[in-house]
Amino acid sequence: MDPLNRSQLGPGCKTQAVVQKGPLDLIETGQGLKVQTDKPHLVSLGSGRLSTAITLLPLEEGRTVIGSAARDISLQGPGLAPEHCYIENLRGTLTLYPCGNACTIDGLPVRQPTRLTQGCMLCLGQSTFLRFNHPAEAKWMKSMIPAGVRAPGPTYNPGSAESESLVNGNHTAQPATRAPSACASHSSLVSSIEKDLQEIMDSLVLEEPGAAGKKPAATSPLSPMANGGRYLLSPPTSPGAMSVGSSYENTSPAFSPLSSPASSGSCASHSPSGQEPGPSVPPLVPARSSSYHLALQPPQSRPSGSRSSDSPRLGRKGGHERPPSPGLRGLLTDSPAATVLAEARRTTESPRLGGQLPVVAISLSEYPSSGARSQPASIPGSPKFQSPVPAPRNKIGTLQDRPPSPFREPPGTERVLTSSPSRQLVGRTFSDGLAATRTLQPPESPRLGRRGLDSMRELPPLSPSLSRRALSPLPARTAPDPKLSREVAESPRPRRWAAHGTSPEDFSLTLGARGRRTRSPSPTLGESLAPRKGSFSGRLSPAYSLGSLTGASPRQSPRAQRKLSSGDLRVPIPRERKNSITEISDNEDELLEYHRRQRQERLREQEMERLERQRLETILNLCAEYSRADGGPETGELPSIGEATAALALAGRRPSRGLAGAIVVSGRCGEESGGASQRLWESMERSDEENLKEECSSTESTQQEHEDAPGAKHQGEVLAVEEERAQVLGRVEQLKIRVKELEQQLQEAAREAEMERALLQGEREAERASLQKEQRAVDQLQEKLVALETGIQKDRDKEADALETETKLFEDLEFQQLERESRVEEERELAGQGLLRSKAELLRSVSKRKERLAVLDSQAGQIRAQAVQESERLAREKNAALQLLQKEKEKLNVLERRYHSLTGGRPFPKTTSTLKEMEKLLLPAVDLEQWYQELMSGLGTGLAAASPRSSPPPLPAKASRQLQVYRSKMDSDAASPLPRTRSGPLPSSSGSSSSSSQLSVATLGRSPSPKSALLAQNGTSSLPRNLAATLQDIETKRQLALQQKGHQVIEEQRRRLAELKQKAAAEAQCQWDALHGAGPFSAGPSGFPALMHHSILHHLPAGRERGEEGEHAYDTLSLESSDSMETSISTGGNSACSPDNMSSASGLDMGKIEEMEKMLKEAHAEKSRLMESREREMELRRQALEEERRRREQVERRLQSESARRQQLVEKEVKLREKQFSQARPLTRYLPNRKEDFDLKTHIESSGHGVDTCLHVVLSSKVCRGYLIKMGGKIKSWKKRWFVFDRLKRTLSYYVDKHETKLKGVIYFQAIEEVYYDHLRSAAKSPNPALTFCVKTHDRLYYMVAPSAEAMRIWMDVIVTGAEGYTQFMN
């Protein structure tokens, strides 16, 4: 290979390998060899004349760097940089980035990124040539070429005369041949849009067959292809076309602000919406070599200029929504223009193009009209001029056609858009490039129908795209045919042309001549048009290079004709188009202002329409009067004018009929179409000549009859007959035209069906190609899917194996965890049992100690009873001594009185000592009262402080009972040992409820015997009598002593009283300390001192005078004693209450008795209060017990719910294990049973097993025996063993035989975890896998085979009752 082309090392080998890997086809074609591949590539032609090899350089997806030292494609040649440029392949679209180095595409230097198109020539550096091939684009372009059309390569002629002035298809101004073009600055957006459109238009270069042979390439400096065209475009060569003038001038630069969107209404659009190409658009095919291209106006600058349908199917539907215009398609079908139109329509509607391929407007003006038959300027009374619209259609040029903008309809424009997309396309195509033909149509709205040449001033300048389009007309045919101009309206009412190919100037003169003869309102029309006839063939102004001047249109009002006739034929000055919708930005206020102006304009035009309709009616009335009043040779022509004005009025009243279709005037090309139209016109002319002859003869005969008539009475009848005949002739003419129109409609329907078939065929081919492509993609995806599924299956198998291994490991870990938990649970259970045992021992010890205390309390009670008896005996002795003392005192008094009387008032010498002894006996009594008061107050506060919860408030009746205390004090003086021995035990506290304390309280409460109580009451009942006498004596002797001793005695008493107070306080403090010291030991019954006076017990709080439990509590105050005291007082059954003593009682004694009765009543009331308080306390205790019971029930419920929740958690965990692991073991039906009275045989029989019918199992209430085959632990051998399940020993043992002499192994119940059927068949070489079950322990897994299925089920249910290895399954 040539070293200048490509290096053989490094990337070169890689590139060759890439090309060889792709589908590279070597095809022998005779003596040649064709190399073909499917990928985009560059064909290197070498760097100079010395290069001999041809290299294919593939362009892979992504970036490919080219240069003398590039890593991808290395080329050697003059002017090549190390990294000269790079080509980026992005999904089939290849773009060249020059990197600032010398690069040309098709001879044009490029300085910025440029898209590469099929067949373009690249020159890198000075002489390194590369051809770019894109097989996909080429294949797609070939598929788009219709059948029978070939696309020869255009001539590469850089030396053409005009090539210097053409860049990217735009003409630059030539000083010698062209007027200077306006230079407008382009915005960046417009430049980018123009550049994109240039690429799009570069992509579609095709030729029509035979064009190259008919016309040499040298005469076509322009590209023979433009814009997707397949339509031949060349400069005009006919004189008629060249007479237009400034056909090759651009009035403004491309995409200048003057080219408004609406000014290019007939410009072929990309798509109805003018949007960017969709993703389905294949790579566009560019032009190559020196093909110069036309840049059409982009769709972005035409917001609503196109009304074509979105899809061919929609377009075909829309084509039948309105009545077809037969004349239109009759003109277009049998000619090369028809082929052009069909292809243009397919180009527009094909979905494969994605709405991106512009339609080329074909100018048929190049065909000379040398064979056109001109009619005389004036034919008076000719019926052929009585057609409904006798106005010229063939004009010198077309008004600038604009699409119907939804926001503004410029005045004076003439529509080419139709409601049918097919007609729309035809009208648009034939209206863009017309240079010598005139396009007219019925008005789309009333304001268009009355605009004539006077509204041309309001038109903006022509779109530069139209101007550029005029630069590329069709090549002139060598044998031109007569060109016929005709238009048939879309409405079923035909409008026939009267001008058969005549020039617009001649026909304007003809109309003017007729107007003069018929007294037209514009009599000088011919004279005004004649002087300007020569100017029509000269150069027009640039703004009207495509035919801005026009005569009166068929919808033109007489006012416009008057303007024409008055000589106002000034050429309007080109103006900038203001208030265009495209010049309005996104500002909402400007849009609102724009719509307001448009609305006012529409209102003005509607008013003008109404005025013009009135004017037309006035003209009709004048014509009718004139025809009746006038006579002569011109009467035959009046109905023609009348009908014309009527048709004008009708068209003015029906503006909507013109909205549907555009009526195109154009010449036909092609021999067949020319002959057909010629025959049609010849037949119509023959009928017109016959009508003319008939009319002339009738006119002559009428004139002769008029001359020969004897009078004027027949003249009115003759006029009526002539008028009726003219009407009949008009109707006949219309019927003929209607018949011809129906024939043309038939032909048009056939042609349209053929066109539809061709469109569908092309669409079908495109869809088939897409289908094949997608099918291949589907096959590739299917292969990838199969490979992916295979890989996924392998990965899934690997993951499943890994998961199974992990599952086994997890299961082992779970077993170990469960074993640990079971051991911990067992240890916890053992510790709990030990604690319960120690608690029971402590409770037993407490109960024993309470019993001991009860015994001690009973002994203390007995001791107290003995002490009470002793005190009573001493009290009796004391009473007897006191009685003797009293008697002795009485005797002493008698002696003293006698001695006083005998001695004359001198006392005994020992009187003071006696008084001192009496004071010693009396003063401690006073101190004792204070001591009792202090003691009771101390006891009350101490008890209240010791038990504030359980003690009721102190009784109010006992607060000021001083007399009772005084009596008890005196009682204690009278019977000194008694107060110290009578005592009651301290009741147990309210918080204690033990039986021992209740027993001690009950025992101590009953301890005083009735006899001792009676003795005590006898001693007490005898107190008042002795007390009265004693007090009287004491009082008298005390007063005597006070008189004698005075202050000395008082001081002594105070001293002794203070000492007694100190002693009482010390004793009360000791008792208080003893009381508080015994307070915490509430179980102890002896909190008070052992010797306590019974009157103190009267003042104890009720809560301390009874036990805790109501059924065992006894009042320590003996109420029976008070009752007996009352009884003894009433009956007087005591020796101390003898009538002798009662006789000595004074009135003071009676008051004291009443006081004691009051005290008894108070005691009864206190007893009732004590009973009530006892009931209240019992109620409180009952409530406390009830609350305690409720609390225990709540705790039990919580415990049950907690245990149920724990059970649910365990079951859930088991279920999760079942779901997660494929080797999860089935749960056994029964949990272990540890009850000692559990009957194994009954349990098995209740489970549904037939124990008696199974001979392989010996079952009793505690033991199960039978033969099983067991697999060995170390050596996996199966041996028959005799198994014994013993619930007494809590073991599962197995022996060599049933004699149970040689023990082989023992399984303890606590080691058995689970018993389950071997559903996984994991036992190796099992004798019978269907009868194999497993016993899992902490250490190993036992496999056993039962002799029968029933035996296996029995053994499994038996062993599971001893499976105590899993403690969480137990309650």
From Swiss-Prot:
Residue segments, region Disordered: 153-182, 211-336, 368-573, 672-714, 942-1020, 1124-1143
Basic and acidic residues compositional bias, start-end: 483-493, 682-696, 703-714
Residues bearing the modification Phosphoserine: 51, 192, 220, 223, 325, 335, 382, 405, 431, 445, 463, 472, 491, 503, 520, 522, 535, 541, 553, 557, 565, 580, 585, 683, 976, 1022
Compositionally biased region (Polar residues): 157-175, 368-377, 547-559
Modified residues (Asymmetric dimethylarginine): R131
Compositionally biased residues, Low complexity: 252-273, 296-312, 464-477, 976-997
Modified residues (Omega-N-methylarginine): R514
Domain FHA residue range list: 64-125
Coiled coil regions, renumbered to chain: 688-798, 1150-1216
Keyword annotations: Coiled coil, Methylation, Phosphoprotein
Domain PH: 1261-1364
Pfam families in UniProt: FHA (PF00498), PH (PF00169)
Modified residues (Phosphothreonine): T524
Notes concerning its domains: The PH domain mediates the binding to phosphoinositides.
Protein name, per record: Pleckstrin homology-like domain family B member 1
